[in-house]
Amino acid sequence: MACYDDFAWFYNRYWSEEFHSAAFPILERIWLDRLPPKARILDVCCGTGYLAALLAARGFRVTGLDVSREMLAYARANAPAAEFTLADAASFHLPGACDAAVSTFDSLNHLLEPAALEAAFRNIAAALRPGGLLAFDMLLDEAYQTRWGESFALVRDDHLLTITGAAFDSHSRIARITVTMFRLLEGAWQRSDVTIEERCYSPDEISQALAAAGFGELLCYDAGDLGMAGQLGEGRTFFVASKLE
């Protein structure tokens, strides 16, 4: 999708490493320690591949998928030991050969309709062996109510980014931000403007979608309680669900 393509350079440079450096110890504690050595892992909405690189370095066999070509271009450079494919979480199809799956950095909040979230869970379940473990994080109501409206600016000599117009509609449950980006390329400034949207799902909606998709046991963990400090952890919950045998 174009909005994620335009955002990929900034995401790769400023956000992916920061988030996944904080998230990886949590994933080790609640999910990775339960997997067999050399497990095959599906990384859904893999972004620029920072998590895939960490997993591959631990000996896991990783397949990443993302809807953005530009994100995947960075992912292939960042994690050459992993495999990547262009696909939408709500419509991909892979054979059930994975031992585990993961989706991080509130990626599943970007699915704006409950039917799309359930479809993503169904697709993930179809890609997992019986008993396979899915780990993911999502932002819940606290995150959108308390910090979503904050503006942000990042200014460097050859690039800048602003986040403005942040809004959360408590009726539709849709949150939006406007991202304006400039990069100095070959002596000329290039501008991109994108709108990024997320949906705030309730814990009940998430658990119901998982159950409908064929997942059983569900464990929930507050990110702050697991050591994810500051805004990264605020209003964020990690989930681990197992596919029914």
Model-identified regions with their sequence ranges:
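Conserved class I S-adenosyl-L-methionine
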Residues: 1-37
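Class I SAM-dependent methyltransferase SAM/SAH-binding core
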Residues: 42, 49-91
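A short acidic, Gly/Pro-enriched loop at the edge of an enzyme's catalytic core
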Residues: 93-100
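Residues lining the SAM
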Residues: 104-106
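A short His-aromatic
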Residues: 109-111
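A short glycine-rich, Lys/Arg-flanked "PGG" loop and its adjoining helix->strand segment in the class I
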Residues: 118-130
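SAM-dependent methyltransferase
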Residues: 135-208
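C-terminal lobe and adjacent flexible extensions of AdoMet/dcAdoMet transferase-like proteins
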Residues: 197-245
